[in-house]
Amino acid sequence: MDWRNQGVVTNVKNQGYCGSCWSFSATGAMEGAYAIAHNKLVNISEQQLIDCSKSYGNLGCNGGLMDAAFEYAIDYNMTTEEELPYEAKGHILCPSVEKHISFSSCTEVTQNNELHLLQAVSQQPVSIAIQADTKLFQFYSSGVITNVSCGTETDHGVLIVGYGVEKGIDYWLVKNSWGPTWGSDGYVKLERTNS
């Protein structure tokens, strides 16, 4: 299963030197859900979340949570990357732009439940948090990172866009926000387990 083949995943993006992974993870899930519902892939603005969701507890380039980003999107709607491009920095004020991409709800997947996550990913790309401060992850280029080496201290928002099996190991196909030169064209395979 690979949502890229269904045309509901935008190209790999690069957050640069801004701690905004949470916004890329959230917009990736929104882009997928919107494309599936409307049969149209739109590139949703991460910058809007960075600049405008502070009252929801997000801190722009200093971190944030995908849940808060989804709450903001439901309350205020979203705009496109074309209308509000990513700048890899935050602004004090929320820019005034047309926000015409609406969402009515989001569903939280049970933590540490592989079956629930598998069911969710079979419906659309899913926003998740992982531990990315390990050298194994940072210098990943191919293969499957196994559960033993994954880590459990979440510090990075990413997007699951599919799943499969490689050399007998079940994996999640994960889109990162460190540009297409990182990993395997911007993607990583993480072993599929309950953690």
Mark where each language-model region is:
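Catalytic-core signature of thiol
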Residues: M1-S195
